[in-house]
Amino acid sequence: MLKEEDKIFINLHGQQSHDLKSSKKRGDWDNTKALLDKGRDFIIEEVKQSGLRGRGGAGFSTGMKWSFMPKNSEKPCYLVVNADESEPGTCKDRDILRFEPHKLIEGCLLASFAIGANNCYIYIRGEFYNEASNIQRALDEAYKDGLIGKNACGSGFDCNIYLHCGAGAYICGEETALLESLEGKKGMPRLKPPFPASFGLYGCPTTINNVESIAVVPTILRRGANWFASIGKPNNTGTKVFCISGHVNKPCNVEEVMGIPLKELIEKYAGGVQGGWNNLKAIIPGGSSVPLIPKSICETVDMDFDSLRTAGSGLGTGGIIVMNQSTDIVYAIARLSKFYMHESCGQCTPCREGTGWMWRVMMRLVKGNAKKSEIDQLLSVTKAIEGHTICALGDAAAWPIQGLIRHFRDEIEERICHLM
């Protein structure tokens, strides 16, 4: 359990004002110049030593990602913050944008300095109108106070931060599609290599990080890498904001230690499963893109990257979707299939054709008028899509179906037999 003094997002639930004055009282912008004066190498090394892994889903070392940026680039460098939070079941970044905007902006300054970027873009989901307004007000306050802009915090470093609103496309959450959209083009993922660190925004070195990943950086630098690394589990350090929704008594966002047991998280903060723990059917532990896990696994699994990977799923965004026995599990996954079909950009044939095909088969399974042989055929198609697309949307469309067949095949077959 996370100690009160170890919480990073003190105002996660908006109990206090999110303006600059209140944020400073909570410790934001506390002698930021001293952190900048320690130099780029110090910041990158400290973030590396903290063990911070990307909070957007991939779980790659944040400090390592920063170190890939060229030290002395002839081209301008950019930092891009991915605030295009569109994953079903995920709303952690939204509350950070709402109630902790100055943590994010201070993190943008420190990260920009670390990678040598004088310009930073916050790419926010188009539907987040109120959140975008909050961020813009916070940016205006920071500029007025001399915290960002020319000679930011009196450090001699110039850092401009811009807010850019997207247009509602889920695919723009993929980092290279986001860059395309930021450049004014249709949001379609790029082939890699080249990677953004060498050829990113406008063909210049670019680092893309998630909102939560950037927002925790100031606290890590103030309290030290060892403090952050002491929280959680080895290779899964620090705190994490989890979103708990679905069939729970109190849906909520909560900051807890990485590696907290899933059962404890739900019972302590979300008031337990509706109808009691024994009424649980399955949980999607990391947003809609990861495979579901049945009650038997939920009993003992911990909420961290490695434990969930071992359990055949993933931490993803930390969006926990709880489903009790009243859930039509086949229809629930079919709805996710429809979402991915709708959000496919159409660039890759396996995804463009496969997502629509999978949804149509899933709907036949929902109605029970499919053949049993189609279950294996469907699984085969998910394997053909997985790993054969430019971006991970193909994998994201395939994994929920794979999880369904792996754990609830009997229920699918029973439905086919019952309705034949």
Curated annotation (Swiss-Prot):
One Gene Ontology molecular-function label: metal ion binding
Co-factor binding details: Binds 1 FMN. Binds 1 [4Fe-4S] cluster.
Sites where the protein binds [4Fe-4S] cluster: C345, C348, C351, C391
E.C. no: 7.1.1.-
Pfam families for this protein: Complex1_51K, NADH_4Fe-4S, SLBB_2
Reaction(s) the record says it catalyses: a quinone + NADH + 5 H(+)(in) = a quinol + NAD(+) + 4 H(+)(out)
Positions bound to FMN: 166-213
Cofactor: FMN; [4Fe-4S] cluster
Keyword Translocase included in the entry's annotation: yes
Keyword terms, alphabetized: 4Fe-4S, Flavoprotein, FMN, Iron, Iron-sulfur, Metal-binding, NAD, Quinone, Translocase
Keyword Flavoprotein: yes
SUPFAM superfamilies to which the protein is assigned, alphabetical: Nqo1 FMN-binding domain-like, Nqo1 middle domain-like, Nqo1C-terminal domain-like
Residues the record lists as binding NAD(+): G54, R55, G56, G57, A58, G59, F60, S61, T62, G63
Purpose of the protein: NDH-1 shuttles electrons from NADH, via FMN and iron-sulfur (Fe-S) centers, to quinones in the respiratory chain. Couples the redox reaction to proton translocation (for every two electrons transferred, four hydrogen ions are translocated across the cytoplasmic membrane), and thus conserves the redox energy in a proton gradient.
Family, as annotated: Belongs to the complex I 51 kDa subunit family.
Descriptive protein name: NADH-quinone oxidoreductase subunit F
Naturally occurring in which organism (per UniProt): Rickettsia canadensis (strain McKiel)
Organism taxonomic ancestry: Bacteria, Pseudomonadati, Pseudomonadota, Alphaproteobacteria, Rickettsiales
